[in-house]
Curated annotation (Swiss-Prot):
Biological role stated in the UniProt entry: Involved in oxygen transport from the lung to the various peripheral tissues.
Domain Globin: 3-147
Residues found modified as N-acetylvaline: V2
Lineage of origin: Eukaryota, Metazoa, Chordata, Craniata, Vertebrata
Entry's Gene Ontology molecular function annotations: haptoglobin binding; heme binding; hemoglobin alpha binding; metal ion binding; organic acid binding; oxygen binding; oxygen carrier activity; peroxidase activity
Tissue: Red blood cells.
Species assigned in the record: Mesocricetus auratus (Golden hamster)
Any single GO CC term annotated in Swiss-Prot or TrEMBL for this entry: hemoglobin complex
Name of protein: Hemoglobin subunit beta
UniProt family annotation: Belongs to the globin family.
Amino acid sequence: MVHLTDAEKALVTGLWGKVNADAVGAEALGRLLVVYPWTQRFFEHFGDLSSASAVMNNPQVKAHGKKVIHSFADGLKHLDNLKGAFSSLSELHCDKLHVDPENFKLLGNMIIIVLSHDLGKDFTPSAQSAFHKVVAGVANALAHKYH
């Protein structure tokens, strides 16, 4: 369970309003697939993932990144109940997709990297700390249904 102060919640939601979520999602998922190439096995049906350029320009990667980040954004509306917010996605990734839950942590790290780049000086150490708590909480919630 993630424990955010009211100030951290306000910081996260305030900064989130400044980002282009679709671009963050596409960049974060693309980076995950490039930096951790073994994660590509879940996306082999996306076509050409043969190079960093191919991954980052792949329309299916961008579309799925958008889908992922919109789920993440929905979770930001439920910071006090992330397990509930991500329950069905946890079940899907566990029972049907068989995704290693460690990958959720890796994707969270990619989200933080992209946010740091996009937000620049607004992504203060306090903001990084708050977002780190959030992505850790989301990763934990997504891993919740694993046996």
